[in-house]
């Protein structure tokens, strides 16, 4: 995957550059070949109009240069594109530290290139096609890229919150600014422009492009809301400016197409409203396709690129709506639903569009620089320069007037508007590429220098002046207004981060100094080269700020009485600022956690969107956090689905057969059996289906007969057709009688069989109604046939009505479909519940992740306690709600948990593939095939069912970690477990009580609380930095085990467990657990498994507190600990050496001592790396337990008590002979031992056969050249987990039977008892 990532990163700029090059080459070729391409709305009417004025001459030139010599000029265009990109890269690199935007440098370079091209024919050949390129094509190539990239990178939540402000500025503000600019141009300039021409100029001048200002605001950490308003206004007013420009351009250059004022207003509304609708439709289609593609970067990037250009072209050319506004909506919708993009692809997608936007800006400003020097400066006089300066001042004043005009409204909606923000918005209204492109359009269409060249000159001048003056001074203005000041909490956070970086550097330096290869390095130079300074340290010298306010550490004062240093409490304002900063950082950390869960496949797309939305809404409100009440709405089912489900269930709700008593008389009993028989129901349904045909034919025949009788002339001979129709009508009437008899028989059978219960069913009521209708229909038909009633229009309508009502019997067929409809509705409800459960689970994990780092967010203890309380309270509330949800809908919880388990396994599988490929054990092709297999399964997981039936309670025992895989042990526990019931509020266990057994929750929800940080269950709510006497709470649900630690240590309960609902549990007494521990001693023994489960549970929070594991998820930490094992301390005489092969050493139980310093270490504790040897004191009440994790690179044998006797003897034998035997013979001996062990395990041989088959220790020692050991007597030692050479053992029970022991020589010459093969003594706890 890493190699694939590198390839994609290399591919992004190459594809982007190639795309731009192809577009520009095709554009220059087409513009040169066909003059001007009519692509805007204003040019749709008449292509001939575009060839007026100087258009014909350019057409001729373009024809000569385009068609006849296209292939000769194409490489020159590519040279220009490549050279422009090179100049852009050099300018961006060289002028990065200067306050001048690099686009200004490119514009100047383009102008210089244009001047050189005017005097040097060789250079002019490479710029000719660019200088004469159609400006419409320029817009269509670059504008979609610039618009989509800006919208796609915007904060959607902030934009939507400020949308009303943006619309006012982009619509009404643009119109006012355009009118004022037009009035200024008409009265200031001596160009004799009319109002239409001046409005066209005003629209161009009002199109803003504040890219440089927005980037600067982000770099300075200024208000995100302000930057979003400025950028959002630019996006929308570009589209509105183009629409206004097209309206007045049509009035200027195409007067024959001039419309009335009302038509122009309608046209503006049509374009401005229909454009976003078109963009919304395309965005939904794009999101749909993206959501069905999994981890394919090329396809997803291509879809967004194609959607962008198709949206702009189709909307702008075919639909005649605003393509700009359509692309804006497209970018915003795709951005808002970016969860439809694969997490692995999202980064590359952003980089791709950033690269395209960079190339587009680079080429636009280079091209405009060339065009301006060759076209705009031709007819410029001194007065034009004066006009330019006045115009620059005027448009700045006009923008300030517009913002001031609408400020009463802007300050009361959205995020509001302060006077400081208004000043920045006024000064930050830069002009850019859109205005230049529109000016080129005017220059291309105008036939006189008064319009075309002046438009281009003034537009280019305003662009340069705003970029050079406004963009370079905006930072100074921010500093003057105090908007660039870094708050005290931010400085404190930065200082804390730098301090932690220094601590990490010091640890790394100390570690490297002990490296034998780096021992002679110059550490002074290394330390100086790695020095990281605080970026905000220079700001602390601000003369306006008090010295104590800028102190990054804790401020203290001297007590006048005792002269002691007393910490100062922050002022209310400081406390509020620190609390607000901590709140925002906490919400940001929660959002990061949500995104991480989504990237790992642990959170659904819609769940991520909801959680991020809740976090962003909370961030907008002061002192607000994510509310549990808002989260509860995700899994609360409301609306039409519950109502529809109830109605459908009411339609099919009938009394059960057992609930309807059988009649006592014989005929009634027979009818009862008939009406409840499946064949009876099927027969009636078949009759209903067959009855549909005559009902339809009756309508057809009746209409046919009516038409024939109407067409027949009086006294004329009628053909034989009516007689045939009459026969058909008679047959249909007879069939109606037959079906009526069938339905009547059905009603009689049900009435006789059900009695008074017949009328209870809604369907029986419906059948009775239809039966009455059919009877009335027959009576009316017979009456008409006999002529008792005069046939007229009214009678015919009555007959048709009754026949139509008779056809309603077909609705009864839907009775069979109602269960299917209920399943569909249940599926929708389950999807909503699954989404809600996913939201709650994601929130819980987010709070747990934040809890690990919250101590490093805040230095103030009061704020820290408050944030912890808020986080833990919200987590517990959601845990409780999800427990109640699981009780009501267990299948939902099972489905979500199953999906998470599957994705975790697949993630680990993919990481393993990457590790194997990185180590060279897999080729790229092999790794790709394996990874493709994993990703196919990941994609299938996206369509997993939202509900899975929960397993039976017996299966919960199989899922207990220390029971999994051992069927004999499971049967043993199942036989001795008792199922207990507890009501709401009952106490299952109480803190301080003696441990009497284990509890496995089968159903319901319990609350657990206690003062110990390591509560006795599977999910200890450990919070980093918790106080010693703090009370911990948590909720447990199905599958959790309570009481393992108490059974092992025989200590009193350390927590109280109460029922939050009615609860069912499996209870295994402590006596039965002791019997099981004594009985099941084969590898791996039950006691070892129990201790290992407890060890991993205790070690997980200890490991996650360490700095090196801060970026790890809980699953990854547990996976890391799975490589660990419990050390058999009895074998090593309660001493343990810590060498370089050990990565983590955790004291789980008891007390240890540092052998060198005699420092006491109490459990639970992660042993420091500075400790190299531990000693332990064995006591009968508290036996020490040590859990170690070896390095991943360690490949040696692990004698940890997990191996059975055969494995240990084999490993010890191999270890002893490894230095005295060649590889061949050592391998032969190891193979022989392996075969013997396999045969012993399969046959279950006795101990005597074991001595005959397994090589004797003395034989091994003789083969290795070691003298046999002499047996000696020694005092018994504490018992170990499993028997092995050199261990002290006593009389044991194997599978419930006592085994006599015989002395065995130990390696140290000590005598120890021997047990039967595979037996393990229990550990005294």
Swiss-Prot record:
A motif (Essential for sodium:proton exchange) lies at residues 237-238. Homodimer; the dimerization is stabilized in the presence of phosphatidic acids. The keyword Transmembrane helix applies. The VSD and CNBD domains are not functional in mammalian SLC9 orthologs. In addition, the conserved Asn-Asp/Asp-Asp motif that coordinates sodium ions in NHEs is lacking in mammalian SLC9C1 and SLC9C2, suggesting alternative transport mechanisms and/or substrates. Residues 28-68, 1237-1325 are annotated as: Disordered. It comes from Strongylocentrotus purpuratus (Purple sea urchin). Residues 575-620, 860-919 are annotated as: Interacts with the S4 segment of voltage sensor domain. A 1,2-diacylglycero-3-phosphate binds at residue 73. Changing residue 803 to Q: Alters the half-maximal activation voltage of gating current. Shifts the activation of the transporter to more negative voltages. It comes from the Eukaryota. One of its GO terms (cellular component) is sperm flagellum. 3',5'-cyclic GMP binds at residues 1043-1045, 1053-1054. The record marks 803 as: Contributes one equivalent gating charge. The chain crosses the membrane at residues 77-96, 102-119, 136-152, 163-188, 195-220, 224-249, 261-292, 297-319, 323-336, 344-377, 383-412, 419-446, 451-481, 678-708, 725-752, 761-784, 796-822. Electroneutral sodium:proton antiporter that regulates intracellular pH of sperm along with capacitation and fertility. Activated in response to egg-derived chemoattractants, couples membrane voltage to sodium:proton exchange and transduces membrane hyperpolarization to cytoplasmic alkalization to cAMP signaling and ultimately to sperm motility. This is Sperm-specific sodium:proton exchanger. It is a multi-pass membrane protein. Residues 796-857 are annotated as: S4 segment of voltage sensor domain. Residues 30-76, 120-135, 189-194, 250-260, 320-322, 378-382, 447-450, 709-724, 785-795 are extracellular.
């Amino acid at each position: 995957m890493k190699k694939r990532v590198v390839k994609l990163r290399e591919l992004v700029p190459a594809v982007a550059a190639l795309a731009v090059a192809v577009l520009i080459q095709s554009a220059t070729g087409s513009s040169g070949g066909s003059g001007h391409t009519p692509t805007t709305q204003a040019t749709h009417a008449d292509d001939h109009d575009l060839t007026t004025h100087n258009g014909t001459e350019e057409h001729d030139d373009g024809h000569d240069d385009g068609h006849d010599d296209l292939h000769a000029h194409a490489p020159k265009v590519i040279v220009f594109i490549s050279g422009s990109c090179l100049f852009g890269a050099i300018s961006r690199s060289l002028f990065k530290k200067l306050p001048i935007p690099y686009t200004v440098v490119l514009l100047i370079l383009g102008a210089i290139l244009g001047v050189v091209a005017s005097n040097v024919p060789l250079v002019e050949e490479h710029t000719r096609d660019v200088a004469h390129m159609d400006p419409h094509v320029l817009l269509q190539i670059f504008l979609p890229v610039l618009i989509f990239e800006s919208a796609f990178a915007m904060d959607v939540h902030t934009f939507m919150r400020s949308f009303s402000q943006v619309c006012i500025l982009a619509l009404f503000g643009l119109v006012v600014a355009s009118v004022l600019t037009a009035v200024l141009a008409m009265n200031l300039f001596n160009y004799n422009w009319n109002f239409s021409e001046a409005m066209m100029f005003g629209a161009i001048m009002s199109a803003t492009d504040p890219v440089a200002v927005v980037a600067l605001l982000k770099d300075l950490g200024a208000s995100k809301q302000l930057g979003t308003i400025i950028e959002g206004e630019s996006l929308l007013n570009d589209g509105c400016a183009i629409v206004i420009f097209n309206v007045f351009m049509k009035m200027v250059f195409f007067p024959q197409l001039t419309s009335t004022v009302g038509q122009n207003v309608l046209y503006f509304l049509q374009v401005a409203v229909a454009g976003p609708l078109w963009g919304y439709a395309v965005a939904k289609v794009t999101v749909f396709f993206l959501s069905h593609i999994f981890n394919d970067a090329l396809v997803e990037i291509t879809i967004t690129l194609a959607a962008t250009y198709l949206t702009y072209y189709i909307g702008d050319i075919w639909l005649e709506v605003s393509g700009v506004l359509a692309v804006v909506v497209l970018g915003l919708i795709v951005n808002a639903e970016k969860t439809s993009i694969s997490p692995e692809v999202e980064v590359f997608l952003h980089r791709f569009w950033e690269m395209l936007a960079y190339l587009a800006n680079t080429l636009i400003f280079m091209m405009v620089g060339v065009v301006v020097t060759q076209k705009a400066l031709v007819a410029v006089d001194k007065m034009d320069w004066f006009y330019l300066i006045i115009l620059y001042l005027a448009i700045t004043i006009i923008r300030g007037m517009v913002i001031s005009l609408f400020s009463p409204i802007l300050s009361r909606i959205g995020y509001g508007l302060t006077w400081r923000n208004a000043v920045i918005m006024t000064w930050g209204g830069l002009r850019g590429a859109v205005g230049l492109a529109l000016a080129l359009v005017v220059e291309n269409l105008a036939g006189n220098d008064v319009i075309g060249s002046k438009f281009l000159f003034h537009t280019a001048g305003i662009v340069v002046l705003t970029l050079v003056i406004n963009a370079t001074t905006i930072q100074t203005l921010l500093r003057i207004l105090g908007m660039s000041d870094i708050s005290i909490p931010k400085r404190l956070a930065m200082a804390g981060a730098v301090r932690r970086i220094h601590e990490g550097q010091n640890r790394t330096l100390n570690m490297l100094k002990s490296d034998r290869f780096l021992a002679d390095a110059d550490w002074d130079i290394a330390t100086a080269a790695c020095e990281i300074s605080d970026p905000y340290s220079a700001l602390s010298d601000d003369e306006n700020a008090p010295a104590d306010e800028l102190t990054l550490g804790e401020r203290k004062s001297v007590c006048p009485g005792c002269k002691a240093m007393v910490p100062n409490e922050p002022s209310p304002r400081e406390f509020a600022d620190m609390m607000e900063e901590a709140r925002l950082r906490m919400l940001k950390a929660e959002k990061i956690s949500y995104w991480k869960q989504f990237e790992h496949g642990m959170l659904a797309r819609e769940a991520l969107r909801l959680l991020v939305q809740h976090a962003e809404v909370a961030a907008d409100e002061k002192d607000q956090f994510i509310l549990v009440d808002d989260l509860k709405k995700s899994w609360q089912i409301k609306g039409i689905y519950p109502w529809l489900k109830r109605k459908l269930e009411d339609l099919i709700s009938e009394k059960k057969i057992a609930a309807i008593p059988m009649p006592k008389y014989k005929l009634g009993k027979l009818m009862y059996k008939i009406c409840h028989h499946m064949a009876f129901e099927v027969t009636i349904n078949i009759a209903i289906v067959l009855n549909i045909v005559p009902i339809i034919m009756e309508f057809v025949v009746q209409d046919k007969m009516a038409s024939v009788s109407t067409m027949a002339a009086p006294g004329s001979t009628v053909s034989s057709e009516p007689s045939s129709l009459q026969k058909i009508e008679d047959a249909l009437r007879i069939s109606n009688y037959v079906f009526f008899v069938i339905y009547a028989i059905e009603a009689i059978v049900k009435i006789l069989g059900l009695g008074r219960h017949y009328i209870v069913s809604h369907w029986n009521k419906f059948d009775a109604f239809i039966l009455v209708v059919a009877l009335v229909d027959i009576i009316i038909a017979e009456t008409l046939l006999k002529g008792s009633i005069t046939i007229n229009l009214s009678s015919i309508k009555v007959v048709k009505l009754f026949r139509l009502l008779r056809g309603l019997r077909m609705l009864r067929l839907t009775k069979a479909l109602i269960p299917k409809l209920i399943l569909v509705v249940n599926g929708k409800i389950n999807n909503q519940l699954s989404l809600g459960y996913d939201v709650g689970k994601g929130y819980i994990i987010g709070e747990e992740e934040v809890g690990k780092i919250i101590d490093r967010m805040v230095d103030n203890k009061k704020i820290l306690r408050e944030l912890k309380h808020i986080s833990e309270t919200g987590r517990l509330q959601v845990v409780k709600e999800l427990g109640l949800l699981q009780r009501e809908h267990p299948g939902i919880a099972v489905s979500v948990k199953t999906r998470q388990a599957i994705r975790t396994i697949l993630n680990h599988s993919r990481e393993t593939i990457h590790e194997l490929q990185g180590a060279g054990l897999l080729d790229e092709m092999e790794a790709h095939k394996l990874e493709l297999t994993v990703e196919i399964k990941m994609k299938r997981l996206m369509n997993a069912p939202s509900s899975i039936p929960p397993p039976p309670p017996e299966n919960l025992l199989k899922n207990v970690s220390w029971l999994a895989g051992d069927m004999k042990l499971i049967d043993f526990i199942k036989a001795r477990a008792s199922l207990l019931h507890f009501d709401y509020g009952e106490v299952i266990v109480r803190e301080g009580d003696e441990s009497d057994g284990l509890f496995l929750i089968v159903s319901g929800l319990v609350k657990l609380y206690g003062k110990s940080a390591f509560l006795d269950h599977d999910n200890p709510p450990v919070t980093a930095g918790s106080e010693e006497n703090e009370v911990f709470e948590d909720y447990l649900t199905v599958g959790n085990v309570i009481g393992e630690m108490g059974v092992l240590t025989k200590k009193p309960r350390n927590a109280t467990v109460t029922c939050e609902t009615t609860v069912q549990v499996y209870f295994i007494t402590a006596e039965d657990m002791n019997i099981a521990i004594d009985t099941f001693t084969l590898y791996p023994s039950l006691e070892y498994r129990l201790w290992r489960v407890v060890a991993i549970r205790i070690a997980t929070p200890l490991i996650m507190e360490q700095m090196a594991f801060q970026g790890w998820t809980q699953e990854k930490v547990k996976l890391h600990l799975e490589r660990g094992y419990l050390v058999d301390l009895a074998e090593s005489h309660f001493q343990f050496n810590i060498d370089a092969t050990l990565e983590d050493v955790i004291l789980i139980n008891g007390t240890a001592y540092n052998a060198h310093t005699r420092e006491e270490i109490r459990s639970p504790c992660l042993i420091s790396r500075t400790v190299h040897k531990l000693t332990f004191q064995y006591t009968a009440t508290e036996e020490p337990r040590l859990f170690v994790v070896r390095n991943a690179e360690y490949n040696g044998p692990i004698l940890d008590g997990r191996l059975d006797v055969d494995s240990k003897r084999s490993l010890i034998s191999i270890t002893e002979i490894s230095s005295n035997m060649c590889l061949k013979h050592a391998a032969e001996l190891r193979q022989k031992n392996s075969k013997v062990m396999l045969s012993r395990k399969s046959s279950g041989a006795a101990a005597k056969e074991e001595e005959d088959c397994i090589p004797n220790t003395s034989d091994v020692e003789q083969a290795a050249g070691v003298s046999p050991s002499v047996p000696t007597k020694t005092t018994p030692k504490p018992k170990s987990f499993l028997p092995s050479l050199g261990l002290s053992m006593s009389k044991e029970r194997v599978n419930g039977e006592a085994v006599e022991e015989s002395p065995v020589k130990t390696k140290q010459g000590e005598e120890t008892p021997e047990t039967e093969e595979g037996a393990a003594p229990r550990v005294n706890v």
